[in-house]
Swiss-Prot record:
Signal peptide from the UniProt entry: none
Record PTM N-formylmethionine, positions in chain: 1
Entry annotated with the keyword Secreted: yes
Protein name: Hemolysin H1C
Species: Staphylococcus cohnii subsp. cohnii
Disulfide bridge map: none
Length: 43
């Protein structure tokens, strides 16, 4: 769960710094970590 929070934090910081490439990759990281977290309930 802490990985998701860290990824969201990175996305927000990148957005505030107008670093759009890092923001995009951070959002993708949030989605991937969220999918892994949800998949953990089904295994």
């Amino acid at each position: 769960m802490s990985g998701i929070v860290e990824a969201i934090s990175n996305a927000v910081k990148s957005g505030l710094d107008h670093d759009w490439v890092n923001m995009g990759t951070s959002i993708a990281d949030v989605v991937a970590k969220g999918a892994d977290f949800i998949a953990g309930f089904f295994s």
